[in-house]
């Protein structure tokens, strides 16, 4: 039977999606299922790994049924996932020994403090391109091994497996036959040396994580194994692509050349710039990470992670009940006319790149009796654009590359006001692609290249098309005045303490 589609599994922080893409890179079907969030203590975020798997199985079944697709028409499966989230499971039973500790969770912050006090920061930075932070997987694995009775000894005996979510999905989809990850996910663990391309003995010793529990690291585009027949109505489908969500979006946006960058506006905001075969060491608070590895060649990226972006709009809607739908924020922001001197620093969980301050909290400045709800909403929406400029300034400083355009994706960029304001504040064109689902598309492309569904990156690059291009049209004096106000607000926020 003719292969007509590639299936992408997009396993995110709050939901799992299965999406079909045709040869033109267009969406041919989608199914989505949310799953529960677990908050055992303030600042802790966990997921039930079995519930994640159930959500994935359900979306695959719904997608095939709704689209009336024969599994034999699927060329391969690409997997993209919430990065850094860590799972440890029993190899014999396949059962997790603890919940998945989510990337957002701060429950390992004390471990991070101890590692910093022991003087490990520079070594971690040099080997991994990362900072010592609770964000990354390594301290999460250590926490599980520290807190589950007998876990570390069982791991040393080879009885336990660790994986980021991609590894967990593949283990289950292949019936426990395949324990792998790819370069992109490995590079987010704080245990993987991005220069030697191997699990690093010194890092593992620092965290007291046994090497026996780690997955094999493979390229981002190859056939890793076949699914069990029960998931695809008696058929086996090759799993052929893996990338962490932000790297998948970089690939889906066809950012194949050094100096091309994308920004994903989701719960948080993640800007990545392709730096080619050069691992650029940041001096400005950014992360150095692996963009992807294909056909024996690894390419790198600079990354700036903003912790709160689209979630600020959700907070206005659900927490403050300022409007009914997230999309209403555009009308409120436009009605305001300007921000009336109001600045909103959404440091709900601290500030990410380039500041990396987890000890501060959100703040609002410039309120007067004349401040309206519209001004407040506008200031919140504008905060996404200001934070992006913070990251872009750092990125251009590190790379020595002046950005010519920014490719944007994610839910918040559907807001035309936000997209235009972003272009104005950056003084750079912002390009919104026709296919908004760039994360899933990137995973599909990686799988399709491995199975021959697509022939080359050149073929993929030709499919990338612009829905709308936003050109900067704000006078320079006004742009710099607004940004200077933001910088003052951030400085004041960082100086404020509640004892």
UniProtKB/Swiss-Prot annotation:
Pathway where this protein functions: Polyol metabolism; glycerol degradation via glycerol kinase pathway; sn-glycerol 3-phosphate from glycerol: step 1/1
Organism domain of life: Bacteria
Known role: Key enzyme in the regulation of glycerol uptake and metabolism. Catalyzes the phosphorylation of glycerol to yield sn-glycerol 3-phosphate.
One GO CC annotation: cytosol
NCBIfam families reported in the protein's UniProt record: glycerol_kin, PRK00047.1
A Gene Ontology biological process term: glycerol catabolic process
Activity regulation, per record: Inhibited by fructose 1,6-bisphosphate (FBP).
Species classification: Bacteria, Pseudomonadati, Pseudomonadota, Gammaproteobacteria, Lysobacterales
GO MF term set: ATP binding; glycerol kinase activity
Residues that bind sn-glycerol 3-phosphate: 13, 83-84, 135, 245
Gene: glpK
A Pfam family of this chain: FGGY_N
Catalytic activity: glycerol + ATP = sn-glycerol 3-phosphate + ADP + H(+)
Chain residues that bind ADP: 13, 17, 267, 310, 411, 415
HAMAP family associated with the record: Glycerol_kin (MF_00186)
Top-level class of the enzyme under EC nomenclature: transferase
Binding positions (glycerol): 83-84, 135, 245-246
Protein name: Glycerol kinase
Keywords associated with the record: ATP-binding, Glycerol metabolism, Kinase, Nucleotide-binding, Transferase
EC number annotated for this UniProt entry: 2.7.1.30
Amino-acid positions noted as binding ATP in the UniProt annotation, renumbered to this chain: 13-15, 267, 310, 314, 411
Family (UniProt): Belongs to the FGGY kinase family.
Gene3D superfamilies: 3.30.420.40
